[in-house]
UniProtKB/Swiss-Prot annotation:
GO biological process: tricarboxylic acid cycle
Reactions this protein catalyses: (S)-malate + a quinone = a quinol + oxaloacetate
Official protein name in the record: Probable malate:quinone oxidoreductase
Family label: Belongs to the MQO family.
Length: 496
């Protein structure tokens, strides 16, 4: 039987929040585009974007202390926090546009107001948090942040965290009422649900992309297999985006572009303790982030989180890190081995040598007992009882390993976009802050991969309609910032 051939304008690989965001933006900018979307699983957002596979934190740098490191001279670095906070405001604006236009329904199903808190104890950590608060206060985006080292005040903000806590402990916290909990799984599936109604958009579930090659005519040829039937297809398109979570690295290697040489991946798995006692769940209404242990990766910063999942309030603590050679929860144990190539073996070995503390930390996490996990939980919930909590597996994250200027390997704890020199291919690697900043990442990608189109009046006007702050800094334009926050709070039904 002849292999089916499909001609398209855009191919999106992976049905997660990134592909949904890019597909939606491109279709709004040019409704005539033909888009083919391929997903290995039988449902969208079942890997990294699923509600149980991530913390659901609307990352805005309100509470995540790893975004504001203390420098050697004692000052607080704020650049990353500012960038992430601006980016999350961009996400809120696009979601507001989609709700206002009726393209997304019931925003309360995917985003809820949940205060973001940072909590620390010990003299040095309290002093750090005070300095962090003062450093962020100079920026309008963080003006509504509150700081307190008063036990009674912190009890108001997070009673469960303070219950049975040693009153002699030196403790401090910050709180931002503007914080949110986001169900990226629901959001992603709703975005794809809308995309599927548009002419020219086709979604293919249970389809594995096993080949990717640049043709002489400048187009890409993707080889795709229907996992359910075994049927194979060839897809031809001038632009391909790979947003396949942990699976992106292997596809980048198949694409064989010069810009992708030297990249490697380090898989880190995660687990949560989920509370099963409704009385305990009701006592907590915040996302409380602490400080990471020495050697711990940034995504392992401990936090006790109120979640809203499928209309129900939930309470999670973690994440506990682990190690698996899989790049996806539904991946293969051979993923790590298959990812090793001549071009990346030196960076991967170099990154391993440089990250001995991380290796030690992961080993300790993997071998810890249920009592060890309870001990970690009790630092944030002193009154916790083992019988009220069950262990759940979270998502799989592949941290980026890339070459530094000397050709040695460095481990990057962030999101990395790799693009071909001609803009015909873009690949998203890495993890946090990921989903929260998806809109800004995709706008930047569009600017790089569609440079001529993005300069046109039509695209410029549409981008400003979807994202009113497009081309401006909300931190610098304080009036616009307040206006946009007021509108997004109203349309997204956020109670601040």
């Amino acid at each position: 039987m002849a292999r089916q051939k499909i001609e398209s304008d855009i191919v999106l690989i992976g049905a997660g929040i990134m592909s949904a965001t890019l597909g939606l933006l491109l279709k709004e900018l040019n409704p005539k585009l033909k888009i083919e979307i391929f997903e290995r699983l039988d449902i969208a957002a079942a890997e990294s974007s699923d509600a149980w596979n991530n913390a659901g934190t609307g990352h805005a740098a309100f509470c995540e202390l790893n975004y504001t490191p203390e420098l050697e001279d004692g000052t607080i670095e704020t650049k990353k926090a500012l960038k992430i906070s601006e980016a999350f405001e961009v996400s809120r604006q696009l979601w507001t546009y989609l709700v206002e236009k009726g393209l997304l329904q019931n925003p309360e199903n995917f985003i809820k107001s949940v205060p973001h808190m940072s909590l620390v104890w010990g003299n040095d950590n309290v002093e750090y948090l005070r300095k962090r608060f003062e450093a962020l206060q100079q920026f309008h985006l963080f003006k509504t942040m509150e700081f307190s080292d008063n036990i009674e005040k912190i009890k108001e903000w997070a009673p469960l965290v303070m219950e049975n806590r040693n009153s002699k402990d030196k403790i401090a916290a910050t709180s931002m009422k503007l914080g949110t909990d986001v169900n990226f799984g629901t959001l992603t599936r709703n975005m794809f649900k809308y995309l599927e109604t548009l002419e020219g958009v086709t979604m293919h579930f249970n389809h594995d992309v096993y080949g990717l090659k640049k043709r002489e005519d400048g187009r890409w040829r993707a080889k795709v297999k229907n996992i359910a039937t075994g049927e194979k297809k060839k897809i031809f398109a001038p632009f391909v985006f790979i947003g396949a979570g942990g699976g992106s690295l292997l596809l980048l290697e198949k694409a064989n572009i010069p810009e992708g040489q030297g990249f490697g991946g380090f898989p880190v798995s995660g687990q949560w303790l989920k509370c099963t006692n409704p009385e305990v769940i009701q006592k907590h209404s915040a996302k409380v982030y602490g400080k990471a242990s020495v050697g711990a990766p940034p995504m392992s910063v401990p936090h006790i989180d109120t979640r809203m999942i499928d209309g129900k309030k939930a309470l999670l603590f973690g994440p506990y890190a682990g190690f698996s050679t899989k790049f996806l929860k539904n991946g293969s144990y051979f993923d790590l081995i298959k990812s090793i190539e001549f071009s990346n073996i030196k960076p991967m070995l170099g990154a391993g040598v440089k990250n001995i503390p991380l290796t030690k930390y992961l080993i300790e996490q993997v071998i810890q007992s249920s009592d060890d996990r309870l001990k970690a939980l009790k630092e944030y919930v002193p009154s916790a009882k083992k019988e009220d909590w069950v262990l759940e597996n979270a998502g799989q994250r592949v941290q980026v390993i890339k070459k530094d200027k000397d050709g040695h390997g460095i481990l990057e704890f962030g999101t990395e976009v790799v693009t071909a020199h001609d803009g015909s291919l873009a690949v998203l690697l890495g993890a946090s802050p990921g989903a929260s900043t998806a809109v800004q990442i995709m706008v930047d990608l569009i600017t790089k991969c569609f440079p001529e189109e993005v300069k046109t009046t039509i695209w410029q006007n549409k981008l400003k309609e979807m994202i009113p702050s497009y081309g401006q800094s909300l931190n610098e334009n304080t009036v616009l910032c307040d206006q946009i926050r007021a509108k997004t709070n109203e349309i997204l039904k956020l109670k601040v």
